[in-house]
């Protein structure tokens, strides 16, 4: 479902809000039908705050990495035009980032790690499937080499978040790390590729 909704939202309907909200509604529907909503206790800290907070903030390194490697990636100029076409302009970027920060990490961790994940210490297929749907967004704009790099990084991230959940018996630290990564990456895209001066 994520693959279809993201593709339909971005490349057929051409609306980023439709894509992300449709994706989230799909997660809510599937998790509800499966009866897989985690209990509130799963979001209680599994470690002390002085461990959880620094670990969570480490996710910001994702944005730093994107900023540093963006010149090397040499994304197609069409990416900036597509962002505008998808409805991401000066008026909508900040609400989009806030929505993504507050909603996306929680739903993705519930869907990909809690419901479809496992306590296996080895990589599993779900880690790769989670990484793969991101490539739908990027495939038209970056080279195959960088698509492979992104795929490996995201697969590794999915695996790492599962291990944190397994060791801590809590979803909090991995979700906050995910949140920091999402926000930092979106802020970099907004500041470097976003149409800051579009009305």
Per-segment meaning from a language model:
Residues 23, 47-57, 116-124:
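Cytoplasmic-side transmembrane-helix entry/capping segments in multi-pass membrane proteins
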Residues 18-23, 80-88, 144-152:
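Non-cytosolic membrane-interface motifs at loop->transmembrane helix junctions
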Residues 93-199:
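Transmembrane helix-loop-helix hairpins at the membrane interface
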Residues 1-9, 55-63, 125-129:
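Alpha-helical transmembrane segments
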Residues 40-104, 195-199:
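Juxtamembrane helix-loop-helix connectors linking adjacent transmembrane helices
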Residues 8-14, 68-77, 135-141:
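Juxtamembrane "helix-exit" motif on the non-cytosolic side of transmembrane helices
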Residues 1-40:
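Alpha-helical transmembrane segments in multi-pass membrane proteins
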């Amino acid at each position: 479902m994520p693959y279809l909704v993201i593709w339909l939202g971005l490349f057929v309907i051409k609306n980023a809000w439709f894509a992300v909200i449709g994706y989230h509604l799909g997660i809510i529907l599937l998790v509800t039908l499966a009866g897989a909503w985690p209990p509130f206790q799963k979001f209680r800290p599994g470690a002390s705050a002085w461990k959880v907070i620094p670990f969570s903030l480490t996710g910001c390194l994702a944005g730093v990495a994107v900023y540093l490697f963006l010149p090397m990636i040499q994304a197609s100029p069409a990416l900036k035009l597509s962002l505008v076409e998808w409805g991401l302009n000066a008026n909508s970027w900040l609400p989009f980032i806030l929505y993504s920060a507050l909603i996306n990490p929680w739903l993705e961790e519930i869907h990909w790690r809690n419901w479809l994940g496992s306590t296996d210490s080895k990589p599993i297929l779900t880690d790769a499937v989670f990484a793969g749907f991101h490539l739908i967004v990027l495939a038209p704009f970056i080279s195959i080499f960088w698509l492979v790099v992104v795929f490996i990084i995201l697969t590794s991230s999915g695996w790492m978040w599962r291990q944190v959940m397994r060791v801590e018996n809590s979803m909090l630290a991995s979700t906050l790390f995910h949140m920091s990564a999402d926000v930092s990456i979106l802020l970099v895209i907004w500041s470097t590729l976003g149409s800051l001066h579009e009305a």
